Design a protein with these regions (language model features):
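Residues within helix-turn-helix
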Residues: 31, 133, 144
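Internal acidic/polar
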Residues: 77-109, 131
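Structural recognition of an alpha-helix C-terminal capping motif at a helix-to-coil junction
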Residues: 35-42, 46, 53-65
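A short pre-motif secondary-structure segment
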Residues: 121-125
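DNA-recognition helix of helix-turn-helix
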Residues: 139-162
Length: 162
């Protein structure tokens, strides 16, 4: 990979607003979104991108991959914490915790319950306004996969909101 060209830097700057919306959509939290956006820009500036890469597509892909890395890390930390609590004889989750979790799930938007793959694709198409072909390029997946994920996401949302 090479450092960014002047054109790629300009394109990246043009994508900041969309990247911010995408980050908020992925994280569901403005603080996490700010952190994710900062990490994305840092990574793109530090690591660069192929000379022929489109800055927008590349930056969305970097953003999504960083978020997936964060989700994996959180999962590992959560499992580790639960294992430690179980080792100390603590049951781990009380009834109050369970009720709070249920209330939280009810309050969450229908988007947040979608699988990450479906949510990312749907957000890029519906919120960011990218075409299926553009999303396929951003996420480096076949266009048919984009189409099926969008369809499944829409069906899931319809079921959830019915």
């Amino acid at each position: 990979m090479t450092k960014l060209t002047a054109r790629q830097k300009a394109d990246l700057m043009e994508e900041l607003t969309g990247l911010k919306r995408f980050s908020v959509s992925l994280t569901g939290d403005s603080h996490d979104a700010d952190d994710l956006l900062q990490l994305t820009i840092e990574r793109v500036l530090e690591k660069g991108m192929p000379a022929d890469a489109h800055a927008g597509k590349w930056s969305y892909r970097v953003c999504r991959n960083l978020w997936l890395d964060e989700l994996r890390a959180r999962d590992v930390r959560t499992r580790h914490a639960k294992a430690e609590m179980a080792g100390n004889g603590d049951l781990g989750v009380s009834t109050a915790d369970g009720l709070s979790r249920l209330e939280f799930e009810r309050a969450s938007s229908a988007l947040s319950v979608l699988p990450e793959e479906q949510r990312s694709v749907l957000l890029l198409v519906a919120v960011e306004g990218h075409s299926y072909a553009e999303v396929a390029g951003i996420l480096d997946i076949p266009i048919g996969t984009v189409m099926s994920r969008v369809a499944r996401a829409r069906r899931s949302l319809a079921d959830k909101l019915a």
